[in-house]
């Protein structure tokens, strides 16, 4: 898998966290230091969860290698549809919090937005990809997107939160479809 495909996956995976960051930014005014710390927590968690998913997928691979492209397609496509539905309906993660959110609550919120990345990690186990590089790209993209989301949230949270979720879902469906079609020899 090439760099640009990984970058698209990373941006797609960061959309959940971006949507939450927009909402947090709209609800709580944070100093730059707190924005940086929160973004790093989200990025770290988002980088670790695809590694965990990849390990599970890697060990399951010998048992389902004949269907691996279908597994990636179904996981990424299903996750993409879920994100699009949430983007349209507004069922995104709950962002209730106190003004002095603890590190523990930040980690839990980050984990809640990164469950999808674990599923992507399972799908990546069935593709030719350097998982450490992929996890690093996902983590960096999430760190940047959360920092941007928290900063811009006060003005843009209500307007773009749902659109970001929907766009992330579209990206995942496109990557899953590309994986399936390329494995079937329909595209290169």
Swiss-Prot record:
Q: Which domain of life is it from?
A: Bacteria
InterPro entries assigned to the protein according to its UniProt record, in alphabetical order: Mntp/YtaF (IPR003810), Put_MntP (IPR022929)
Q: Name one GO biological process term.
A: intracellular manganese ion homeostasis
Give the subcellular location.
Cell inner membrane
Membrane-spanning segments = 3-23, 35-55, 63-83, 104-126, 140-160, 167-187
Q: What kind of membrane protein is this, topologically? A: Multi-pass membrane protein
Please indicate if the UniProt record lists Disulfide bond as a keyword: no
Q: Does the keyword Transmembrane helix apply?
A: yes
Q: Which UniProt keywords apply?
A: Cell inner membrane, Cell membrane, Ion transport, Manganese, Membrane, Transmembrane, Transmembrane helix, Transport
Q: Name one GO molecular function term.
A: manganese ion transmembrane transporter activity
Under the cellular component aspect of Gene Ontology, which terms does the record hold?
Answer: plasma membrane
- Which PANTHER family does the entry link to? MANGANESE EFFLUX PUMP MNTP-RELATED (PTHR35529:SF1)
Q: Name the family the entry cites.
A: Belongs to the MntP (TC 9.B.29) family.
Function, in words: Probably functions as a manganese efflux pump.
What name does UniProt use for this protein?
Answer: Putative manganese efflux pump MntP
Provide the species name.
Neisseria meningitidis serogroup B (strain ATCC BAA-335 / MC58)
Gene that this sequence comes from: mntP
């Amino acid at each position: 898998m090439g760099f640009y495909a990984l970058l698209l996956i990373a941006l797609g995976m960061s959309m959940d966290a971006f949507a939450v960051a927009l909402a947090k930014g709209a609800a709580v005014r944070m100093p730059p230091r707190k924005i940086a710390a929160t973004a790093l927590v989200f990025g770290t968690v988002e980088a670790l969860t695809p590694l965990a998913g990849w390990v599970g997928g890697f060990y399951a691979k010998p048992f389902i290698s004949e269907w691996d492209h279908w597994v990636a397609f179904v996981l990424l496509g299903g996750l993409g549809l879920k994100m699009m539905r949430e983007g349209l309906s507004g069922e995104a993660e709950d962002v209730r919090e106190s003004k002095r959110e603890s590190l523990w609550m930040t980690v839990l919120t980050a984990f809640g937005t990164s469950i999808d990345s674990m599923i992507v990690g399972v799908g990546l186990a069935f593709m030719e990809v350097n998982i450490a590089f992929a996890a690093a790209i996902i983590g960096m993209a999430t760190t940047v997107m959360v920092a941007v989301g928290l900063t811009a949230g006060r003005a843009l949270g209500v307007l773009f939160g749902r659109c970001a979720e929907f766009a992330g879902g579209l990206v995942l469906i496109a990557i899953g479809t590309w994986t399936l079609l390329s494995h079937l020899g329909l595209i290169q």
